């Protein structure tokens, strides 16, 4: 009986140790070639951005307040704007939970298209 109890407690302990993870991939292609390829992961509040391909040589990011949506105008200014060269990554630990993003091969002031 005791081994079953210990095994059950170990399983519960491991279940409590799982990290909160979110992944988003943005990828566009033209004629079978990546024009933009970006990956964002958020693990336990640490957001990691990775620029894997961009026709311009850089991935340009806008990070938005959780109340904003990338497909609509928002009165609030972006939380952060930055660019990454292809093959590089950037981490942030201070972003609000639920932030939105848009990424493009060229610098933009807003995410939505007019």
Where is each model-derived feature located?
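Extracellular/mature segments of secreted proteins
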Residues: 59-60, 66-69, 76, 81-84, ...
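Intrinsically disordered, low-complexity Pro/Gly/Ser/Thr-rich segments with frequent PxxP/GP/PP motifs
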Residues: 70-100
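Sec-dependent N-terminal signal peptides
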Residues: 5-12
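Positively charged n-region of N-terminal signal peptides that target proteins for export
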Residues: 1-3
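Terminal connector regions
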Residues: 92-114
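Post-signal peptide N-terminal segment of mature Sec-exported envelope proteins
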Residues: 25-43
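N-terminal Sec signal peptide cleavage junction
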Residues: 16-17
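Post-signal-peptide N-terminal segment of Sec-exported extracytoplasmic proteins
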Residues: 39-67
């Amino acid at each position: 009986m005791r081994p079953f109890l210990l095994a059950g407690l170990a399983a519960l302990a491991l279940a409590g140790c799982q990290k909160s993870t979110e992944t988003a991939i943005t990828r566009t292609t033209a004629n079978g070639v990546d024009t933009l390829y970006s990956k964002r992961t958020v693990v336990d509040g640490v957001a990691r951005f990775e620029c894997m391909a961009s026709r311009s040589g850089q991935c340009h990011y806008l990070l938005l307040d959780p109340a904003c949506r990338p497909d609509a105008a928002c009165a609030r200014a972006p939380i952060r704007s930055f660019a990454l060269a292809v093959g590089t990554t950037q981490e942030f630990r201070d972003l609000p939970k639920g932030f939105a993003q848009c990424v493009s091969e060229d610098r933009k002031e807003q995410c939505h298209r007019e």
